[in-house]
């Protein structure tokens, strides 16, 4: 199969040295999904590709690709870089985890659909200074569908009731209303935590405004999401361990 030279738009979210002077990098792209590229000579100080392979660089990347395996980074233009991420440990830890999580939800060259914008909007919101914990919880909850384990959050799993007091049941695969609290095992969340999880899972991230959520409530919803992931996805990501160390949990 002949290789094509084409431009892809997106963000470089991971890189590692390959051999003596080359770099392997992962791109989150609108056109092709996740793509691993090799930047030949990218480690050399005078490399023309050095600027394009810094972590969390946004832009247009010219790649030589066969739509499988490793593509080759050839050119770049319209780069946008965020130097503050090199010194802001919190932002860096959150972003590294979210893209690592998304990287495990999709195969390479799989179209991302709306998830492309989900991660890009999350990236830009965190860079701009919005609460990274709330942004992270939105992404975590909405990626469950990409993993094939989307919970039912719009209404009670058992009876379909949409309003009232709810709790989350991992066994039932979603929220249950108070009429059925004794019927299934549940997480025994506070009504506020369940309401927050439902809101974050169903809210388009582009519509998220400036909101103030108490630390205790955020911690409760974070623990619940961790339990959901452990029971349904069961990933053990070093990036999550690092994030937990950074945020002290």
From Swiss-Prot:
Is Zinc found in the keyword set? Answer: no
One Gene Ontology BP term is: double-strand break repair
User: Which Pfam families does the record cross-reference, listed alphabetically?
Assistant: RecO_C, RecO_N
Keyword set, alphabetical order: DNA damage, DNA recombination, DNA repair
A GO cellular component entry from the record: bacterial nucleoid
Q: Which InterPro entries match?
A: ARFGAP/RecO, DNA_rep/recomb_RecO_N, NA-bd_OB-fold, RecO, RecO_C
Q: Which SUPFAM superfamilies match?
A: ArfGap/RecO-like zinc finger, Nucleic acid-binding proteins
Q: Give the family from UniProt.
A: Belongs to the RecO family.
What PANTHER family does this protein's entry cite? DNA REPAIR PROTEIN RECO
Function of the molecule? Involved in DNA repair and RecF pathway recombination.
- Please identify the protein, giving its name as recorded: DNA repair protein RecO
Give the originating organism. Answer: Lactobacillus delbrueckii subsp. bulgaricus (strain ATCC 11842 / DSM 20081 / BCRC 10696 / JCM 1002 / NBRC 13953 / NCIMB 11778 / NCTC 12712 / WDCM 00102 / Lb 14)
